[in-house]
From Swiss-Prot:
Function summary: Can catalyze the hydrolysis of ATP in the presence of single-stranded DNA, the ATP-dependent uptake of single-stranded DNA by duplex DNA, and the ATP-dependent hybridization of homologous single-stranded DNAs. It interacts with LexA causing its activation and leading to its autocatalytic cleavage.
Protein encoded by which gene: recA
Organism from which the protein derives: Rickettsia bellii (strain OSU 85-389)
Lineage: superkingdom: Bacteria
Subcellular location: Cytoplasm
PROSITE patterns, A to Z: RECA_1, RECA_2, RECA_3
InterPro entries associated with the record: AAA+_ATPase, DNA_recomb/repair_RecA, DNA_recomb/repair_RecA_CS, P-loop_NTPase, RecA-like_C, RecA-like_N, RecA_ATP-bd, RecA_C_sf
One of the GO biological process terms: DNA repair
Name under which the protein is recorded: Protein RecA
Keywords, alphabetical: ATP-binding, Cytoplasm, DNA damage, DNA recombination, DNA repair, DNA-binding, Nucleotide-binding, SOS response
Amino acid sequence: MSNIDKEKAVAAALAQIEKSYGKGSVMKLGQRPNVDIESVSTGSLGLDIALGIGGVPKGRIIEIFGPESSGKTTLTLHLIAEAQKKGGTCAFIDAEHALDPAYAKKLGVNIDELIISQPDTGEQALEIADTLIRSGGIDMIIIDSVAALVPKSEIEGEMGDAQMASQARLMSQALRKLTASINRTNCITVFINQIRMKIGVMFGSPETTTGGNALKFYASVRIDIRRIGSIKDKEEVIGSQTKVKVVKNKVSPPFKTADFDIMYGSGISKEGEIIDLGVKLDIIEKSGSWFSYNSVRIGQGRENVKQYLKDNPKISNEIEKLVREKSSKVTNINFEQEEEVND
């Protein structure tokens, strides 16, 4: 078969597929209208840079996991706030029945516009998620958490009954069903997950996430979030130092990390990140405990500079813009980069 005959045969096959399944069901990759991946900011400047595309990708599955009280829900609430700022409609499937509306509001979430569901079973939660995603009107959906997606058979059974891998089977089936809808509707789907310990592990990390292996395969981005220290004002703890690691990334190079502060009652400290990244990129000068911008001293001590940037949003936005511009040109901004990861 000559090249011309091959081209004609392919064109005829493509026309037949489009006739059967609709226009856009098959195409050459270069013909796709959106080659660039759209994203939504995470609310953390450092994490946006670590993800490589300025946030989490649209139309993909995201998994955020970590130990208890590490900031998983805080990060997802910031994601919702950022999506709503862009005019997006968001939904929150609260399988843990633990969402605090007052805290969500403090983080910038418009709770009047947030769709919330508190399902009774894992099947109900995932069916609700599927219906919302298929509607095409939802820009972001959060499922909190995979561990709380309890199968109906387990809820209706007796305490102590052996339910062999029922949750893993449920997740595997649901993700097979959801993936195509998520991509077609461009909906960001975020699963919050918890960590468990594997018994009898001699080598490597004993940590694993709940719900089987399906989510690890289907997720385009997996973010590991950990609390690494406390922030104190004299003796009072006012926040936590947090480290995030992008352990899987299908849209940019993975294994990058970012550090930020989560302040109690107000969430991720944007000003703290601007200072740290500004110093790393030589936008802010640091001499001893003094910080300067454009050769003008802006404060002594990190907490004082954070307050200065809060009081002067124009300068804060100016430095943030410079950080984003400079970080896109610099391949290494002293972010740690891991070479391997344990599930």
